[in-house]
Amino acid sequence: MTFKPFLNPEDIAVIQTEEKNSDKKQKRTPEQIEAIYTFGNNVLVSASAGSGKTFVMVERILDKLLRGVPIDSLFISTFTVKAAGELKERLEKKINESLKSAESDDLKQFLTQQLVGIQTADIGTMDAFTQKIVNQYGYTLGISPIFRILQDKNEQDVIKNEVYADLFSDYMTGKNAASFIKLVKNFSGNRKDSKAFREMVYKVYAFSQSTDNPKRWMQTVFLKGAQTYTDFEAIPDQEVSSLLNVMQTTANQLRDLTDQEDYKQLTAKGVPTANYKKHLKIIENLVHWSQDFNLLYGKKGLTNLARDITNVIPSGNDVTVAGVKYPIFKQLHNRIVGLKHLEVIFKYQGESLFLLELLQSFVLDFSEQYLQEKIQENAFEFSDIAHFAIQILEENHDIRQLYQDKYHEVMVDEYQDNNHTQERMLELLSNGHNRFMVGDIKQSIYRFRQADPQIFNDKYKAYQDNPSQGKLIILKENFRSQSEVLDSTNSVFTHLMDEEVGDILYDESHQLKAGSPRQQERHPNNKTQVLLLDTDEDDIDDSDSQQYDISPAEAKLVAKEIIRLHKEENVPFQDITLLVSSRTRNDGILQTFDRYGIPLVTDGGEQNYLKSVEVMVMLDTLRSIDNPLNDYALVALLRSPMFGFNEDDLTRIAIQDVKMAFYHKVKLSYHKEGHHSDLITPELSSKIDHFMKTFQTWRDFAKWHSLYDLIWKIYNDRFYYDYVGALPKAEQRQANLYALALRANQFEKTGFKGLSRFIRMIDKVLENENDLADVEVALPQNAVNLMTIHKSKGLEFKYVFILNIDKKFSMVDITSPLILSRNQGIGIKYVADMRHELEEEILPAVKVSMETLPYQLNKRELRLATLSEQMRLLYVAMTRAEKKLYLVGKASQTKWADHYDLVSENNHLPLASRETFVTFQDWLLAVHETYKKQELFYDINFVSLEELTDHHIGMVNPSLPFNPDNKVENRQSEDIVRAISVLESVEQINQTYKAAIELPTVRTPSQVKKFYEPILDIEGVDVMETITKTSVDFKLPDFSTSKKQDPAALGSAVHELMQRIEMSSHVKMEDIQKALTEVNAETSVKAAIQIEKINYFFQETSLGKYIQEEVEHLHREAPFAMLKEDPESGEKFVVRGIIDGYLLLENRIILFDYKTDKFVNPLELKERYQGQMALYAEALKKSYEIEKIDKYLILLGGKQLEVVKMD
């Protein structure tokens, strides 16, 4: 059959015009049409976020099919397996649609064949394709087609460590042993083992594997920097130019600053100020030295230049004008710090070259021996397979030609995340002019997987400058987000991203534009919000130790806004997504959302199975059974819900003997043979007896039964499986416990038997900071999503919260003793012995670690690459939102503006600032403050802790999937159902007379309140209808020295203090302080009493003053006893108590009571103690036969003292 020909540029222009004039609701853009139909040359499509790149790719493939190109003549590479599956689904749908409209039978037959061929076509990841090549042609390299992939990191580590150990031993005894030892020590620091060196070897090996030819890179590039940058003349010209530019920029910024209105140039007498003269001198010198550099210094004089600059500029980074600090000298300081010592560095740097050659030799030998071991095992890593495939195509012209002839077009999605191995594969498969590449350098966020955005960037610049090499098409219309999201994203990155940081200039060609009229509609309520927790408050810990965690207060801030969206704007939870930087350290979010009833599901990427509480409890149970002398595990088991020992119980057991293991202390307590056996109460003795019998049963059972049976015996004996089933997230918890039993069973089926081996395997996994995959359960549909920014790439969500924007970027790599560059090779910190330099004869050595010049150059390159990737990560996160975007962090409301008021450079934040800022928040606040006169389309709002109380946040009404009170529905056994039916009949009778049945002879007012609350409704509230949401709190006992104050102890001390104060007509602070010394309490408890509040009570409140005036009528700490009658049984009982104080007047009594409870709303305490105060009033009324009794609560537990009158 005859197919339609491919379109030429004129034909494409006609389609673009027709599309523009059509009445389609959603029109294709001219650039999309161009990307779909352009033919005959390489095409690079730079597709901004939400611009429809997948649509373009599918339409282009379909157009190829309709023009007679079979699906198996296309090579289509996707970034993930999931993306490949989605692409196939879309293609199937499109082909089916074309089948329905096809007019000829031949076309229908052809399209049907393509529909069938989709599943076997080359549509998938590069890893999958390279496996296919090696399976088919691996014989040319001697590779068996029946190989397996080494995906288990633990298995990889075992083989690698064995190879490394053997090779290390050989080098330690080889001819260069002395130099090798020096090499190892150079990377070991203060450590006395070679683990640090091993980590460096593995790092170099992994880096080399990301190149298209690891061996060639190691031989030709690895030492390039070390061999090149050996003296001043070898310093790259661009580095010198960069330094001179920084000098010019610093001078210009300082000049702009001195011209500011607030800058004080002259004194009152009209004479230039000392600061102004100093700054003018700095400007003059920096300009002069940079302009006449070659004449004054040259490359050989760089050290002198660095010293001259150091002498003329201040030691600090900032210049302060009108109270605002400007980091004018920060970048210049950073650039000259390494130059000042270059003479010394060059003197010793040469010594490191031989060591690096030795390292090169070691890594090459390791790579070869590791590969040979994998060949013996016939098991390979993905990188091995990729390199095999490249080798096959490079060394076999016929095979390469076969593929090049086969493929009409070589297509790749997410091109910005390609690494050099993948790029080489694409080059080998292409005929040189049939590549179609789709991507967006602004979304390149996989550098940690060795992706190199410069591959995309080089193509972009080449096609932009020379269209004959390929066609560059830019898709900038966004079809995802409302204008509020697009505008705020543009306003941020217009001032942030350029080629220096970000790798591309975010100009008009890259700015996002709404692709439809619907998106251009304005919704002022959806303006992007930066929500910041105000860290001016003392309660918030803003220390570096907490900088990676999302604080509970930040989580509350998010919860508050989500509850508002849900209740006030009817936003379903499933429309809301939280984005975080990493999969770990998100416990604060989970706990906070659980507390406020917000349903939350994670993306499934978190591997925290072994860290889930219920699994940790079981693992500690198994550890204790295996080895009872494991104190940590045993205490955890005792403290767990299985046995319920509290801290007091554990302390009583612990002091039975100081030196013994805890298990022996338990046994001493069991036999009552310890040093303090009198402290073992009958109740505790019963607990210990029960534990010892159960525990010994488990230990005996473990000797003769499988792990699977043991685990289920534990579940059944202590009802632990049922217990977790009553907790929040019950399905997940029970699934985790069930999976533990299954995994133990699978472990024993592999031939490994015994509890000890299973425990060692688990501990090994944890030791290597690994985990087992989480167990999947059916997740709620209407729930907030929590996922990483990386995981969210390519997805879209209506409401997006980007959390923890104040989290610092990880810069750990730039402090490593070894930094690698793809183009310059290795740079190291060299540890030189400078004893002779210092003429030091006493010490055996004076070791100094110095950053070699290759290290300094690589470090700067790596820092910029890291910052660029973080900037692109922020871009990806912000462009996920459809309707509204939130960015959440924490900062000081009073200090932030001064910190970020910068001088603009070419409509961008100064490069110095962008290089030194280390959080998303820094960038956002700096843009907002520096360009505050422009419309930036995002607001900054600070939230205080006072706005994050439970009252302000609110609560989502919890809903249960079943009625927990219906026991019949929650049991399967018919016997249990019948038994429950009988018991419930009895229970109805018992419940009616519950208070009488449980009634003691004597009770306190608080206990009476507790017993009779359900039926007497003392507080005026129907307690039985109150929904109480409980949370699990399983913590190990804290035996540290830090101690929180016991509220009961504090309350008792306050009451004693109030009794001891010598009352008079004028109580002074001295009287209160004197009384405090007489209080019988610990020093820490007395220190916690806020005597200022008590003094305020007597000096400022009406009640306090009146008590002093009527001091002769005052009664304090008055005991009473009162006979009461049970309304159900008619039995009489006695209520006893002590009244804090009252004034006995002629015709009335004024009753008052001190309360130290913490509170925010005093009305809550008023409601809580209504019943207790009523009992006190009743006792006084009966004693004195006075009807009028005024009741007051004196509340000491709030920020301020409150006196509340009771009804």
Curated annotation (Swiss-Prot):
Residues at which ATP binds: 47-54
GO molecular function annotations of the record: 3'-5' DNA helicase activity; 3'-5' exonuclease activity; ATP binding; ATP hydrolysis activity; double-stranded DNA binding
GO biological process, one term: double-strand break repair via homologous recombination
InterPro entries listed in its UniProt record: AddA, DNA_helicase_UvrD-like_C, DNA_helicase_UvrD/REP, P-loop_NTPase, PDDEXK-like_dom_sf, PDDEXK_AddAB-type, Restrct_endonuc-II-like, UvrD-like_ATP-bd
Swiss-Prot/TrEMBL cofactor(s): Mg(2+)
Classification via Pfam families: PDDEXK_1, UvrD-helicase, UvrD_C
UvrD-like helicase C-terminal domain span: 508-794
Catalysed reactions, as listed in the record: Couples ATP hydrolysis with the unwinding of duplex DNA by translocating in the 3'-5' direction; ATP + H2O = ADP + phosphate + H(+)
EC number: 3.1.-.-, 5.6.2.4
Keyword ATP-binding attributed: yes
Coiled-coil ranges (or none): none
CC annotations in GO: cytosol; DNA helicase complex
Keyword set, alphabetical order: ATP-binding, DNA damage, DNA repair, DNA-binding, Exonuclease, Helicase, Hydrolase, Isomerase, Nuclease, Nucleotide-binding
Top-level taxon of origin: Bacteria
Domain (UvrD-like helicase ATP-binding): residue spans on this chain: 26-482
Quaternary assembly: Heterodimer of AddA and AddB/RexB.
HAMAP family named in the record: AddA (MF_01451)
Role summary: The heterodimer acts as both an ATP-dependent DNA helicase and an ATP-dependent, dual-direction single-stranded exonuclease. Recognizes the chi site generating a DNA molecule suitable for the initiation of homologous recombination. The AddA nuclease domain is required for chi fragment generation; this subunit has the helicase and 3' -> 5' nuclease activities.
Membership in a protein family: Belongs to the helicase family. AddA subfamily.
PANTHER family: ATP-DEPENDENT HELICASE_NUCLEASE SUBUNIT A, UVRD / RECB / PCRA DNA HELICASE FAMILY MEMBER
Name of the protein described by the UniProt record: ATP-dependent helicase/nuclease subunit A
Originating organism: Streptococcus agalactiae serotype Ia (strain ATCC 27591 / A909 / CDC SS700)
